[in-house]
UniProtKB/Swiss-Prot annotation:
Record has Transmembrane helix as a keyword: no
Biological classification of the source: Bacteria, Pseudomonadati, Pseudomonadota, Betaproteobacteria, Burkholderiales
Record-linked InterPro entries: Flavodoxin/NO_synth, Flavoprotein-like_sf, Flavoprotein_WrbA-like, FMN_Rdtase-like_dom, NQO
Family indicated by similarity: Belongs to the WrbA family.
Pfam families: FMN_red (PF03358)
EC number(s) given by UniProt: 1.6.5.2
Binding-site residues for NAD(+), renumbered to this chain: 12
PANTHER family given in the database record: FLAVODOXIN-RELATED PROTEIN WRBA-RELATED, FLAVOPROTEIN-LIKE PROTEIN YCP4-RELATED
Enzyme kind, highest EC tier: oxidoreductase
Keywords annotated in UniProt: Flavoprotein, FMN, NAD, NADP, Nucleotide-binding, Oxidoreductase
Cofactor(s) needed for function: FMN
Name of the protein: NAD(P)H dehydrogenase (quinone)
Protein's organism: Burkholderia ambifaria (strain ATCC BAA-244 / DSM 16087 / CCUG 44356 / LMG 19182 / AMMD)
Cofactor binding note of this UniProt entry: Binds 1 FMN per monomer.
Length: 200
């Protein structure tokens, strides 16, 4: 049984929604156990509520020590100036002990993201995230162009060969589109299929 973790940080629910569809795609693959978790919030609770952060997310909070228990980890983050969110960075900065042991070497790592605008740094967020995963010795998996949603030209949409993305809009009012969610499910399924092959 291959084990897949979908691990995310979401401020306003966009990445949370994408994570749920990533997990749905992974669960569609036979022989896969899927876990959905989030990283801890670093903003004090009163401040988080004051700025509208979604604090009532159902997914349990992950710990660094559990990461080696999975064959594949699909990470999700909103964009912060072309990079991952500080909450995800803080979590990953605690994985030095895992790096010392080589505990994540050979495991699949994949990334999805959310940006405020079409040109808000979705691709650089994912590719810069890859640097950390490569230092951990993980095997990077993106979204191949076999996923038809990547070539959808009928609308403004997220989605890259590096990983699924969604465009939240400058005010956060736009929710993930059907095309973006299709790409998310594809990514989850694709990673899960590869995890089964690697685990066998």
């Amino acid at each position: 049984m291959a084990k897949v973790l979908v691990l995310y940080y979401s401020s306003y629910g966009h990445v949370e929604t994408m994570a749920q569809h990533i997990a749905e795609g992974a669960k569609s693959v036979p022989g896969v156990e899927v876990t959905l978790k989030r990283v801890p919030e670093t903003i004090p609770a009163d401040q988080a509520k004051a700025i509208g952060v979604k604090v009532d997310q159902a997914a349990p909070v992950a710990t660094v020590d559990e990461l080696p228990n999975y064959d594949a980890i699909i990470f999700g983050t909103p964009t912060r100036f072309g990079n991952m969110a500080g909450q995800m960075r803080t979590f990953l900065d605690q994985t030095g002990g895992l790096w010392m042991k080589g505990a994540l070497v050979g495991k699949i790592g994949s990334v999805f993201a959310s940006t405020g605008t079409q040109h808000g740094g979705q691709e650089t967020t994912i590719t810069s995230f890859h640097t950390t995963l490569l230092h951990q010795g993980m095997v990077i998996v993106g979204v191949p162009y076999a996923c038809s949603g990547l070539v959808n030209m009928s609308e403004i949409t997220g989605g890259t060969p590096y990983g699924a993305t969604t465009l939240a809009g400058a005010d956060g009012s736009r929710q993930p589109s059907a095309n973006e969610l299709d790409i998310a499910r594809y990514q989850g399924k694709h990673v899960a299929e590869l995890a089964v092959k690697l685990a066998s």
